[in-house]
Design a protein with these regions (language model features):
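Extracytoplasmic and endomembrane cell-envelope/extracellular-matrix remodeling and assembly machinery
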Residues: 1-179
Length: 179
């Protein structure tokens, strides 16, 4: 890819921290995964992790999914388990990684370990994988897509804020993205 060519150039890399390079390589690995180029996704994910360490969480994720899709289940498990244990990873991503680590362990016949990862995934109640994990564990899942009610005091408060009137005007003309 063009992005990878830019990163391969040492003159460009000298301006990046290791964390930034790891993040960029993680994005490239994810793009390779999205476009179904699993071998390159795995290779670039490994490179991202080697350079960016804990700043390459997307690399672990992309590498794990690409490895799973290409039937490299042990490798997928390494990526997902490492992501679960990664310091500073977002709760949603940890939940997702734990769910996929559960699938790897279940496929390998490790039921007890599978349940451990499923339990970790279920701890993030406000995520897709958390909801799926809770359902798989037999817990009641109450999903609601209702928007919270807005009280008149909130609307008055918002209107009094800098830019509040502009926001309401943009909403009235249907320009919700700019609002």
């Amino acid at each position: 890819t063009g992005a990878l060519d830019v990163l391969k150039n040492p003159d460009n890399r000298r301006y990046l921290t290791k964390a930034e390079e790891g993040q960029l390589r993680s994005e490239i690995a994810h793009a390779y995964f999205i476009f179904g180029v699993d071998a390159k996704a795995i290779r670039e994910a490994r490179h991202a992790i080697g350079v960016g360490k804990s700043d390459a969480s997307l690399g672990y994720w992309a590498g794990g999914l690409a490895a799973w899709r290409s039937a490299q289940y042990d490798l997928a498990g390494q990526f997902f388990r490492s992501l679960v244990d990664l310091p500073g990873v977002s709760p949603g991503r940890r939940s997702a990684a734990a769910f996929w680590a559960h699938r790897v362990e279940l496929r390998a016949g490790n039921a007890a370990k599978s349940i451990e990862y499923l339990t970790i995934a279920a701890q993030e109640i406000d995520s897709f994988y958390g909801a799926v994990a809770r359902e798989a564990l037999g817990q009641k899942v109450a999903l609601s897509f209702d928007l919270p009610l807005m009280h008149g005091r909130f609307i008055a408060w918002l209107a009094a804020r800098p830019g509040g009137q502009r926001m309401f005007g943009l909403l009235q003309i249907g320009n919700t993205h700019s609002a």
